[in-house]
Amino acid sequence: MPFSAKTEYGLVALMDLATAHATGDLVQTGEICRRHAIPERYLEQMLTALRKGGFLKSVRGPRGGFLLARPPEQIRIIDVESCLEGEVSPARKGERQDPEFQALSELGNRLEQARAAILSETTLAQLVQKRDQMKQLQPMFYI
């Protein structure tokens, strides 16, 4: 059960903002778009939702931008996903009563519970740490 494009882009933007969080620097939408090739209008919608959800603060004006409203250690991934997508739950319409389908339904429920548990215990700070580890593993090409 991968993330939707909306949640992926939102999390990428939050990781970008988490990097600037330590210094308190504002990050402009255009900067995030350029660094991560995210369509600007789409990103603006997500950042607005994240601001309304209490994850971001915004400052208006030519030198304005966004910053995290709280430390990355206090932002859980499941909360970000819920903010951007609404409550995420599996869509199972008209479940069949056959034992085979009931067994599959039970398995699906267990998968959803495991996913929710992982996302509940994973913070933005942990995601940033994992990103930084992966950057260290990327080969450097010098010209």
List PLM regions with ranges.
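C-terminal regulatory/oligomerization modules of transcriptional regulators
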Residues: R96-I143
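Alpha-helical residues within the helix-turn-helix
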Residues: R34, R51-K52
